[in-house]
Amino acid sequence: MSQGKIVQIIGAVVDVEFPRNEVPKVYHALKVEGTEITLEVQQQLGDGVVRTIALGSTDGLKRNLLATNTERAISVPVGAGTLGRIMDVLGRPIDEAGDVQASDHWEIHRGAPSYEDQSSSTELLETGIKVIDLMCPFAKGGKVGLFGGAGVGKTVNMMELINNIAKAHSGLSVFAGVGERTREGNDFYHEMKDSNVLDKVAMVYGQMNEPPGNRLRVALTGLTMAEYFRDEKDANGKGKDVLLFVDNIYRYTLAGTEVSALLGRMPSAVGYQPTLAEEMGVLQERITSTKSGSITSIQAVYVPADDLTDPSPATTFAHLDSTVTLSRNIASLGIYPAVDPLDSTSRQMDPLVIGHEHYDTAQRVQQTLQKYKELKDIIAILGMDELSEEDKQSVSRARKIERFFSQPFHVAEVFTGSPGKYVSLKDTIRGFKAICDGEYDHLPEQAFYMVGSIEEAVEKANKMSAKA
């Protein structure tokens, strides 16, 4: 194994000089002697010098320290030994529960499955969240993005999806915490532990306080573990169906921006790295389903300054099957989950995939909400009295629909005090169809707020009239 010596340190970027005939390849991992630090080669500068990013703090590094070339990319433990464990970007345990007992190690830089290996599925994945199941249904083996600005509920929505899908889903889950709060990682661990599904989850964290190299690579570490479960065939020649949760894809882009600037690349639009689309593609193209197994991924995407046209969320949009857009305006009305039904989309929204009843109900709900949106300006200026009877009826139904989209979450029970509700797709379609048909025009709109099924809204209305 060849050895080089450190010649320059600029923050997280370290230059290492090797003998000219032993220069390491791009993406090879280097180990710095006398420290725990791993460096990943990013560029070859010529004259035997390579530019690397440090996966760990560079505190205490100095020039002339020796770095050994491992002659392979960063490799992480994969397989059953990773389940129930919390690991860092290099696959080292950070839960103080001993070494990870893994039978195999895979490199984190891998190719995407070939065209002939990929498969597409139209099977729906029920989430139990009304607004998602009705307006932007998820496909099994699909990619879902939760878009939202700061504090509109991306992580809470993701936790509820984990609660509803991962607990009911008999398969395995991988959670990659990319540049998020350590507290949220801790909450997630205890949530999984309390619900006895920890032995089906592998957790990989590279949190906010870590150097950009860690945050840039931790998503690939989590993805590699998920790929192993998908591709490793059992006795029947089948892989597994895996759930991959990534929180937050924006921090992955941001880490790439930091590294790009340190590597001396010229920034592109809004200061992002010029390789933004390529970096996103490298990650997203690997998150796919093959003929042997599937990866269903749910990714939170932070939207800077609530601007969906920002290059980072805009680049992410192209890779997704379903987009769930969280709106600050809806959150300000106290309607949670704050999903914007007019801005959320799904490729599954096709009568041949979801059925005619579901499709027609979703279209009617969308039309009613769109009409209300158009009438809002008139109402603000002239008031409700100036509207025609038909428009008044549309507004009344739209307000009921808006409130009926709200739902108490299981993971928010500790904050709200009201028990969480899981609503089946059948009940969701039935409820919204009845509202659009005018069956509940006589009920007050408050009765539809924070309930599960339509029967609960009727019950709440009866209680309200009894109190009155």
UniProtKB/Swiss-Prot annotation:
Gene3D superfamilies reported for this sequence: 2.40.10.170, Bovine Mitochondrial F1-atpase, Atp Synthase Beta Chain, Chain D, domain 3 (1.10.1140.10), P-loop containing nucleotide triphosphate hydrolases (3.40.50.300)
Record SUPFAM superfamilies: C-terminal domain of alpha and beta subunits of F1 ATP synthase (SSF47917), N-terminal domain of alpha and beta subunits of F1 ATP synthase (SSF50615), P-loop containing nucleoside triphosphate hydrolases (SSF52540)
GO MF annotation: an example: proton-transporting ATP synthase activity, rotational mechanism
EC code(s) of this entry: 7.1.2.2
UniProt GO cellular component terms: plasma membrane; proton-transporting ATP synthase complex
CDD domains noted in UniProt: ATP-synt_F1_beta_C, ATP-synt_F1_beta_N, F1-ATPase_beta_CD
Entry binding sites for ATP: G148, G149, A150, G151, V152, G153, K154, T155
Membrane topology classification: Peripheral membrane protein
Catalysed transformations (reactions): ATP + H2O + 4 H(+)(in) = ADP + phosphate + 5 H(+)(out)
Subcellular localization: Cell inner membrane
Pfam families with a match to the protein in the record: ATP-synt_ab (PF00006), ATP-synt_ab_N (PF02874), ATP-synt_VA_C (PF22919)
Keywords associated with the record: ATP synthesis, ATP-binding, Cell inner membrane, Cell membrane, CF(1), Hydrogen ion transport, Ion transport, Membrane, Nucleotide-binding, Translocase, Transport
PROSITE patterns linked: ATPASE_ALPHA_BETA
Main function: Produces ATP from ADP in the presence of a proton gradient across the membrane. The catalytic sites are hosted primarily by the beta subunits.
Family named by the database record: Belongs to the ATPase alpha/beta chains family.
NCBIfam families tied to this protein: atpD (TIGR01039)
The protein's name in its UniProt record: ATP synthase subunit beta
Species in which this protein is naturally found: Xanthomonas oryzae pv. oryzae (strain KACC10331 / KXO85)
Gene that produces this protein: atpD
